[in-house]
């Protein structure tokens, strides 16, 4: 009687059960799944910051597995895909959470290519193995963008994007509580399979923008009454061709049927069903970009310098209605890493537990809707903002960590940046010279005080800096502004 050939999905499920059970029970024997021509790569970076390279052969794979120090390794399988590939092989894609040595659980993706072993029917070995942690690929921190002043064109603002922050900020933290299991594979909870996972694509290395909306105080508004209110820098999302990628798979809700229980393999594994994204506010999306001709707009409540012909009254009224009430920066909070399916009412109810929310707005990124949203929360007092900053990290829905920061003006950010450069310049100036550290004042002034110390170089008195880097060739960003 001829044995029926098993389906690729059945082979993949059985392999996943055996592999992760052995990873939990006896990881020192994990190399037996591999052959002489196998390749193995485990996510991470080396000492120089480069991704780990693959190792080849059963012996090298054995040493690599031992170097990873697997101990009490517990795995939660969220989804398994298996398809037939060349030469009667099977490619298996696994997504789940992994906890090693009692550490917090971390999301991972692992791909196996199973090849037939010799002439033995239905026997496979791992020809290729690729493992990556998601938090090493997708970062939840967002790079900060210094918003241009109101006298500059928005196109110039988009050309001066800073470098993104390191994405490996929380490499050892997880969003889930570790649940010990006996065989290393645990059936996930019902609600955990419906969690939204908004993660940006790492392959394109798209620079995220975290706009810090600049708001002037009342004195500055009186001096610049014709200056337009700063518009939210939200560009209309350009919908690219929807190509299939694993980043889009992980960003969708995964069905509970695509899990592996502790007793074996689930009866059926469904591919994730893509769900439509929640549309952002039409008011934000329909907002036109600023141009230089739109700047001279009047604001009610302040004396204008003089009317100018050619202004659109409707556009002026819409802008004034949106930005009549101005709140201090200490009452406002920047909130990043918002899920796509969130609405303003849900977010407002969440922050009402900290204080009275008087205004809230959610903005979307302009990169095809694939990046997390961000927004601003305004309280009627500065005390809730300080409580939230002290209580970080802020977990939303119990699983999504929100990136909360105090709102700062552009002038404050420039003072911090310039102050750092001048401090280093003062340290270098104080370290040189035969008299040792001389403090803030020059050597000539110390000589006048106590009659000792070397004379100033060249017979010229040293100039005292203002601490702001305002002198020629002083300050980190002086050359750039010219």
Curated annotation (Swiss-Prot):
Gly residues composition-biased segments: 433-445
Primary residence: cytoplasm
Activity regulation details: Under physiological conditions, G3BP2 adopts a compact state that is stabilized by intramolecular interactions between the RG-rich and the acidic regions that inhibit phase separation. Upon stress, polysomes disassemble and mRNAs are released in an unfolded protein-free state.
Phosphothreonine: residues carrying this PTM: 227
SMART domains hit by this protein: RRM (SM00360)
Segments of this protein annotated with the region RG-rich region: 404-476
Post-translation changes: (Microbial infection) Cleaved by foot-and-mouth disease virus leader protease; this cleavage suppresses the formation of cytoplasmic stress granules.
A single MF term (Gene Ontology): mRNA binding
GO biological process: innate immune response; mRNA transport; protein homooligomerization; stress granule assembly
Top-level taxon in the UniProt lineage: Eukaryota
UniProt keyword list: Cytoplasm, Host-virus interaction, Immunity, Innate immunity, Isopeptide bond, Methylation, mRNA transport, Phosphoprotein, RNA-binding, Transport, Ubl conjugation
Result, substituting residue 158 to K: Found in a patient with a neurodevelopmental disorder; uncertain significance; no effect on function in stress granule formation shown by rescue assays in transfected G3BP2-deficient cells
Residues with PTM Phosphoserine: 141, 149, 225, 466
Modified residues (Omega-N-methylarginine): 457, 468
Spans annotated as Disordered: 140-171, 187-318, 408-482
Outcome of mutating residue 399 to D: Found in a patient with a neurodevelopmental disorder; uncertain significance; no effect on function in stress granule formation shown by rescue assays in transfected G3BP2-deficient cells
Amino acid composition bias (Acidic residues), ranges on this chain: 140-158
Effect of residue 151 to N: Found in a patient with a neurodevelopmental disorder; uncertain significance; decreased function in stress granule formation shown by rescue assays in transfected G3BP2-deficient cells
The protein's role, per its UniProt record: Scaffold protein that plays an essential role in cytoplasmic stress granule formation which acts as a platform for antiviral signaling. Plays an essential role in stress granule formation. Stress granules are membraneless compartments that store mRNAs and proteins, such as stalled translation pre-initiation complexes, in response to stress.
Domain notes: Can mediate both protein-protein and protein-RNA interactions via the NTF2 domain and RNA-binding domain RRM; protein-protein and protein-RNA interactions are essential for undergoing liquid-liquid phase separation (LLPS). The acidic disordered region acts as a negative regulator of phase separation.
Protein name: Ras GTPase-activating protein-binding protein 2
Annotated organism of origin: Homo sapiens
Upper classification of the organism: Eukaryota, Metazoa, Chordata, Craniata, Vertebrata
């Amino acid at each position: 009687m001829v044995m029926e050939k098993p389906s690729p999905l059945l082979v993949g499920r059985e392999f996943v059960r055996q592999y992760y059970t052995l990873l939990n029970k006896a990881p020192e024997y994990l190399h037996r799944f591999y052959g002489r021509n196998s390749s193995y790569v485990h996510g991470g970076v080396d000492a120089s910051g480069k991704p780990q390279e693959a190792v080849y052969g059963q012996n090298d794979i054995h040493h690599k597995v031992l170097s990873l120090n697997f101990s009490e390794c517990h795995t939660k399988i969220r989804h398994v895909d298996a398809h037939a590939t060349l030469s009667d092989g099977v490619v298996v894609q696994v997504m789940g959470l992994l906890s090693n040595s009692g550490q917090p659980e971390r999301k991972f993706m692992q791909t196996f290519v199973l090849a037939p072993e010799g002439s033995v029917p239905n026997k496979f070995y791992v020809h290729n193995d690729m493992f990556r942690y998601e938090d090493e690929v997708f970062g939840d921190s967002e790079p900060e963008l210094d918003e241009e002043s109101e006298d500059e064109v928005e196109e110039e603002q988009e050309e001066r994007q800073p470098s993104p922050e390191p994405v490996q900020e929380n490499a050892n933290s997880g969003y889930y509580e570790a649940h010990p299991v006996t065989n290393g594979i645990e059936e996930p909870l019902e609600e955990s399979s419906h969690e939204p996972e908004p993660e940006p694509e790492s392959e394109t290395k798209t620079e995220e923008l975290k706009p810090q909306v600049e708001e002037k105080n009342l004195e500055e508004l009186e001096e610049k009454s014709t200056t337009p209110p700063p518009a939210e820098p939200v560009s209309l999302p350009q919908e690219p061709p929807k190509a299939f990628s694993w980043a889009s798979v992980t960003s969708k809700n995964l069905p509970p049927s695509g899990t592996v229980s502790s007793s074996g393999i689930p009866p059926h594994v469904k591919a994730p069903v893509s769900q439509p994204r929640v549309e952002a506010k039409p008011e934000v999306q329909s907002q036109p970009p600023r141009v230089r001709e739109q700047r001279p707009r009047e604001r009610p409540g302040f004396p204008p310098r003089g009317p100018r012909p050619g202004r659109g009254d409707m556009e002026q009224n819409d802008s004034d209605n949106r930005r009549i009430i101005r709140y201090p920066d200490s009452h406002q909070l920047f909130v990043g890493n918002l899920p796509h399916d969130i609405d303003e009412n849900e977010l407002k109810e969440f922050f009402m537990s900290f204080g009275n929310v008087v205004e809230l707005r959610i903005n979307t990124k302009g990169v095809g809707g694939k990046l997390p949203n961000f927004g601003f929360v305004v309280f009627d007092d500065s005390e809730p903002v300080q409580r939230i900053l002290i209580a970080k990290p802020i977990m939303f829905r119990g699983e999504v960590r929100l990136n909360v920061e105090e709102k700062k003006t552009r002038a404050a950010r420039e003072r911090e940046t310039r102050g750092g450069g001048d401090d280093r310049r003062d340290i270098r100036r104080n370290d040189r010279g035969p008299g040792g550290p001389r403090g803030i004042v020059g050597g000539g002034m110390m000589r006048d005080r106590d009659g000792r110390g070397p004379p100033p170089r060249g017979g010229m008195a040293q100039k005292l800096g203002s601490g702001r880097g305002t002198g020629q060739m002083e300050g980190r960003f002086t050359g750039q502004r010219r």
